[in-house]
Regions:
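Cell-envelope and extracellular/periplasmic
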Residues: 81-461
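Cysteine-rich modules of extracellular adhesion/ECM and protease-associated proteins
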Residues: 1-80
């Protein structure tokens, strides 16, 4: 067609869309002679609007593919599973050793086996409401905090709370070699999966195992002196892969089994200034961002004995797992904690950029006492490194550590990674730092679930 003295294709020309002098508005494209929204990368045009088919409940996985009311769209699939099983493994912290019972009521529809959270492998014949119990040595686990906070977050987003079945099968004091595939502890976990699917099926419900969670690593520090198991990173990867392979073979599910775990934060209680375990936990999650998730460190929580958490501390830790579950299973995005993303030396300044879930960064000396320099330390291999003269927030996602002189060639920055041998773990004594973000996600008790910076050590050259 001739418009303004020129031949134009009115089927695609944005100045003459469908006819001469019929321009499309800014942000619209001319498609088949009609002005339609020009969709950004990652979205598609459905019913005249740009939508993300990975998350849109009306167009889940494609246009006009709607999820049932109350079900979210996660990674282009409607999440309608009736019973979602979350497994807990590890050692005494995973079993709630010395943690007083806090969670005695079930606010949602979350479940345990009839034998309780620490379910064992025998007599698993039904489901009961998820609450915590005391067995003479163990009480509150992360189960209730994790599942109940997740339920709150699902409801706050406008969806039906998922029904989480949670069961623990860790063993006090066991390092990885004693809980890995082939051990009685591992087989107890598989027995719980088999029973979970059988009971759900008998009730006419669909069932999947979504995640294995762990509180672990302390014994892999103790049993491999002086600083811990150097192969722990490979153990974490193997651990998850074994769970996924065996669970998928057993249940027939194709959904991946993701691994959520926290950092060891109490190695000083065992007489060590430094541990190899926390950095391996951090780096393994960074190397496997779609399957392994480091949830949080534990230095800001309250402890009973410098190693084990109080009931309130365990409940709070569980809520951090619940927050990570929401990120992965409702938002459909990888979880990453507050941690460093880049660091450079600029004269006497070490400038560290952080991946911050919710900016801005804050130095909090109320929840955690300042161990000196907000938890930062510096070494350069010289035996006489320059001292830290200042630590400042140089941006909403940046920290600058200023040294007293030029660093040597083996410069290394530490955060909450060095402590006093013999010191109890915790917010006033253990290896710790004061750096957190501004996440206002409310806990079950109403306080904000700030993300605290993970233990880390960074080579700078």
């Amino acid at each position: 067609m001739v418009c303004d003295g020129a031949c134009v294709d009115v089927m695609s020309d944005e100045a003459h869309c469908g006819g001469c002098e019929q321009p499309c508005a800014p942000g619209e494209a001319c498609t088949a002679g009609a002005c339609v929204p020009q969709c950004d990368e990652g979205t598609v045009l459905c019913a005249g609007a740009c939508v993300d088919t990975n998350l849109d409940v009306a167009h889940c996985g494609g246009c006009d593919v709607a999820c049932d009311s109350g079900d979210p769209c996660v990674q282009a699939q409607c999440d309608a599973v009736d019973v979602v099983h979350l497994l807990i493994t590890g050692q005494s912290l995973s079993n709630g050793y010395s943690s007083a019972v806090v969670s005695t009521m079930q606010p949602h529809g979350n479940l345990s086996f009839n034998t309780g959270v620490r379910a064992g492998a025998m007599g698993l014949t039904g489901f009961i409401p998820l609450v915590e119990t005391w067995d003479g040595a163990h009480g509150e686990t992360i189960a209730s905090g994790m599942a109940n906070l997740a339920g709150n977050l699902w409801a706050a987003a406008g969806f039906d709370a998922r029904t989480f079945l949670v069961s623990a099968h860790g063993v006090d004091g066991f390092n990885y070699s004693k809980v890995k595939k082939g051990t009685p502890a591992y087989m107890t976990g598989m027995a719980q999966v088999m029973a979970g699917q059988a009971i759900a099926t008998a009730l006419g419900q669909t069932y999947e195992v979504r995640a294995m969670t762990a509180i672990h690593g302390e014994s892999d520090h103790i049993d491999y002196p002086p600083e811990g198991n150097p192969g722990y990173a490979a153990n974490l990867v193997e651990w998850r892969a074994d769970y996924e392979a065996d669970i998928q073979a057993m249940t027939g599910q194709t959904t991946p089994v993701r691994f959520f775990y926290c950092q060891v934060s109490s190695w000083t209680a065992y007489g060590s200034a430094h541990s190899l375990i926390p950095e391996q936990q951090r780096m393994t999650a960074l190397a496997n961002p779609d399957r392994l998730y480091l949830v949080t460190p534990k230095y800001f929580l309250q402890y009973t004995d410098g190693v084990h958490l109080t009931g309130e501390g365990t409940l709070l830790l569980g809520e951090y797992y619940g927050k990570a579950l929401r990120r992965v299973y409702l938002d459909g995005l990888p979880w990453a904690p507050l941690g460093p993303s880049a660091a450079i030396i600029n004269g006497v300044d070490v400038v560290v950029d952080f991946a911050v879930p919710v900016p801005p960064l804050v130095f909090d000396e109320v929840a955690v006492t300042n161990p000196g320099n907000y938890g930062f330390a510096f070494s350069d291999g010289s035996g006489n490194p320059p001292a830290i003269s200042a630590v400042t927030l140089s941006g909403p996602t940046q920290v600058t550590v200023t040294l007293s002189g030029a660093p040597g060639p083996q410069a290394r920055l530490f955060y909450a990674a060095l402590g006093q041998p013999g010191a109890a773990g915790g917010p006033t004594t253990g290896p710790r730092g004061n750096l957190r973000d501004s996440d206002a996600t409310p806990s079950l008790a109403g306080q904000p679930l700030y993300n605290w910076a993970v233990h880390f050590e960074l080579p700078l050259n």
